[in-house]
Amino acid sequence: MAGKVLNKVMGFLGLEDEYEYEEYYEDTDELENSNESAEFEPIIHSNKKQGKVVSIHSTSTPKVSIVKPKTYDEVVDICDDLKDGKIVIVNSIELDPKVGQRLVDFVSGATYSLNGTLEEIEKGIYILSPSNVEVDSELKNQLSSKGMFSWNR
């Protein structure tokens, strides 16, 4: 009995003897009626997960949403825009610093979970981009130049 339990535990852990279950078969005579042949379809197992195919070359340009939240409750709308694939520019300058930090923390987590990026353009102004959009430094310089954000000056 202890041998059976030990064999089951070793089998569960993958440590069982490979040769224990091999059986040797004797040659069998061919079927008397050789005109009948067995038809079968091979079963192909694939370990690859079938992923969602997304076109890299899309003809539509990404939409940009500019948000100047007045309360923390607007964070849900910001995250919804990001989920919809929009680039979101958030101006949190007029918020209380603690509320602004909470908003940035929440949006940062949402951006991370969507594989996007969050970058600070200026103090209190952030750009959130979805995973399929890359913001280069030239664009950040243009956005932070004088006159681009009229609400900041």
Curated annotation (Swiss-Prot):
Protein name listed in UniProt: Cell division protein SepF
GO biological process: division septum assembly; FtsZ-dependent cytokinesis
Residues annotated as transmembrane: none
Keyword Transmembrane helix: no
Biological source species: Clostridium tetani (strain Massachusetts / E88)
HAMAP family, sorted: SepF
Family membership noted in the UniProt record: Belongs to the SepF family.
Compartments in which it is found: Cytoplasm
Keyword Cytoplasm part of the UniProt annotation: yes
UniProt keyword terms in alphabetical order: Cell cycle, Cell division, Cytoplasm, Septation
Record function comment: Cell division protein that is part of the divisome complex and is recruited early to the Z-ring. Probably stimulates Z-ring formation, perhaps through the cross-linking of FtsZ protofilaments. Its function overlaps with FtsA.
Subunit record text: Homodimer. Interacts with FtsZ.
InterPro entries in alphabetical order: Cell_div_SepF, Cell_div_SepF/SepF-rel, SepF-like_sf
GO cellular component, one term: cytoplasm
Pfam families linked to this entry: SepF
